[in-house]
């Protein structure tokens, strides 16, 4: 079965490619920029439009139909809404977008709505306020972060006193920022897969960050925490991969972000025995709703890897918007 993966110049798209490299599924890479590394590590690759282009959905369907892709995996948050809003169009062309419905996308794309969802379902989350309405209800330190559109640690500010607060507030859009309680403790990134409104698997990784990205991860087995994450996902009811980020304080998990997509650590999870893209592909191609997997408690050390690409191949991609690759892996 062929599978399209978008935004393969970025970490999420590349992680999906790596997770599927040694499976029966063949990936077709799509990226809007010619120098996206993933374009040169999939069997076939295409230059595609940006997600805000009116032709984006038509082009994704055209590429998927041409390559007989039964599923399409998004690699960027900005692609989630156009794919989700057009699920029916894709399905009418025998293509399943690995995305949740628009209601779930809206909750996860807005950190304030995420907190409201968690609170309404009695799950712990940091106390959170709109920046424009904030009246110093929290003790310092506090965290300022974008309400919508942020990813990784971009735009996230830890504030230690009123002087810092005033300085930072003057430099941000107060209508798109929230103030959040700082939760100290071990940070976890938790992968899940949901099929037919039921969470069918979870994986827990304690992580260390560098510049907002996971660079050391430790896979742990903790049934109590797994059950907690599963309960959140069963309440949210996404489709496919969904990533929960939390911190443990006094053994209480506080969720501060939910991403309704695969993660930059998707390939790391596959190494530990929990291959989210493969589970989803097995569902699409074989109808498997109760996947079997065995999670290994291992340490994942992430590092840069170089990919050498000839000038000729890059020029062909520029001029033709399409190339074929052989025996190249990320």
Regions picked out by a protein language model, each given a short descriptive name:
Residues 104-184, 194-198, 223-226:
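Active-site nucleotide/adenylate-binding loops and adjacent lid/helix of ATP-dependent enzymes
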Residues 234-271:
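Conserved metal-phosphate-binding beta-hairpin within the catalytic cores
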Residues 1-98:
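ATP-binding N-terminal substructure of ATP-dependent carboxylate-amine bond-forming enzymes
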Residues 218-219, 263-279:
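ATP-dependent carboxylate-activation loops
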